[in-house]
Amino acid sequence: MSASPLDILQSVFGYASFRGPQQAIVEHVTAGGDALVLMPTGGGKSLCYQIPSLLRQGTGIVVSPLIALMQDQVDALREAGVAAAYLNSSLDAQAQRDVERQLLAGELNLLYVAPERLLTGRFLELLERTEVALFAIDEAHCVSQWGHDFRPEYRELTILHQRFAQVPRIALTATADPRTRDEIVERLALQDAQQFVSSFDRPNIRYAIAQRHNARSQLLTFLDGHRGDAGIVYCLSRRKVDETAAWLSEGGIEALPYHAGLDAATRAANQQRFLREDGIVMVATVAFGMGIDKPDVRFVAHLDLPRSMEGYYQETGRGGRDGLPADAWMVYGLSDVVTMSQMIAQSESGDDRKRVERAKLDFLLSYAEATQCRRELLLAAFGETFPGPCGNCDNCLEPPKTWDATVPAQKALSAVYRSGQRFGSGHVIDILRGIDGERMNQLGHDRLTTFGIGADMDEKQWRSVFRQLLAAGLLATDPEGFGTLRLTTASREVLVGERKIHMREETRPARRASRRRDSQLITGASLGIEAYEQSLWDALRALRSKLAKQHGVPAYVIFHDATLLAMLRAMPENEGDLAEVSGVGEAKLKRYGRDFLDVINAKE
């Protein structure tokens, strides 16, 4: 009797049941149908083509642009007992010939290949001499010329339909709006493709945004809750990446920089350390992340605003891919708004593109200043309605206090108008607070009717008002004027008293714990590990690291954090008990079961 999809899921991958639409997708593709799968990061897309490849006759060919990721994906499959290989430029000629021989001999269940390799005449001829089970086209949004990850070679993959019409194809992506989905189906010539669209929601990620006061101090306070965790800290500039990685390292945190300005060898070495070691913090520009499949990233922090909600979703989505709790944390301030506006204005894009970018920034700003559930707003950006509140974002957990800021807003807008809409927030705040000085006198601004009318509020309070006016679209920065402020069409309603304005109260940042208390923080705290479980948790992770080094694979390839946590809670006494733990398949049980049981039994 042949194996069923559930048999393969349990015996090979060690999971008791499918999640979401996985089973329907697997059955559809196994039966020979084309499919487009839109599933969020961490949703289990890989199983949707891996299991059909094991159930169908022949070899599953996986097309992926992420060369750096292929080896880890193949290592993980081999550890699970699957015959897998990859073909890319990192292999020498002999190794490539060995893989081709295995393919022709029918010895492989799965072969990963880059699109540019697949499209060569030689490789296509090789495939015609091979029994192909299916084609899986990963990161399928790369086909869209409107997307930020456009890869021209993806548009040539129509050839798979032309030359292998009877072989099913499954296109997968974590990010595609309806327009991009239609483009994927058209460009790849998918035939009667069934579309499986999952929710964009990542319920295990906790979203939080704080006003920037002292970014370094705020980041350190945040990291105190992630002692020993792997995470990513995003910065806008290369210089800020280098500086942040340096001072984190000086503070005893294993932090590495990553940006396009580093030489290729350094980037590769830092990426390998991040993937293969526990507890590394990668400080990076957005150049880092595409193709990072590390499941146990416990936090993603932004020290600067991302470019759009899509960018924010994609970057924060690199946390918690194993389904365990992860934090998406960001600080931002008034300067971010000015900087991002200038970047859009000074780019070489056409006017239409700039308008789109500006609208995306406006949406992101309204998200950052929102007082309602963050998850509701985030999913709304992708056309999805969430029946909030979610209970797992800062606004749900600690609803922000608001205040009636109508009068201060009117004063601020009046000061911008009366000073000629030619100055930035710093000078306008000085006008409002009545700060006298030589420049103020030269400009004659000490004689404006708005001079000193805001003296009852300090600079910090006024900066908050201006930041929130910008986020609400009641002020705009002049793209040609180096951050100078101007009124918008919406400003009039406020000025004439037709619209009330409520703003978030400024919150004081939490003070960092003392050094003595810091030393008592435990690793794994972000996963809810208690102090009495600490020694066993550390022992399980130490064993995993040791085995990973011996086998030359990343630690998560041995077992995910989720599997170690399940062991910690189940306390299995024998191999039968361990086989029941989620993530422990037959091959891994045979290879590592005794080692992990010895550690668990020694701690009882």
Pin down the residues of each PLM region.
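Helicase motor core with emphasis on the C-terminal RecA-like subdomain
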Residues: 2-12, 16-20, 24-36, 40-46, ...
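Short, charged low-complexity linear segments at domain edges
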Residues: 352-384
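Accessory DNA-binding and partner-docking regions appended to nucleic-acid-acting proteins
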Residues: 1-8, 356-358, 385-604
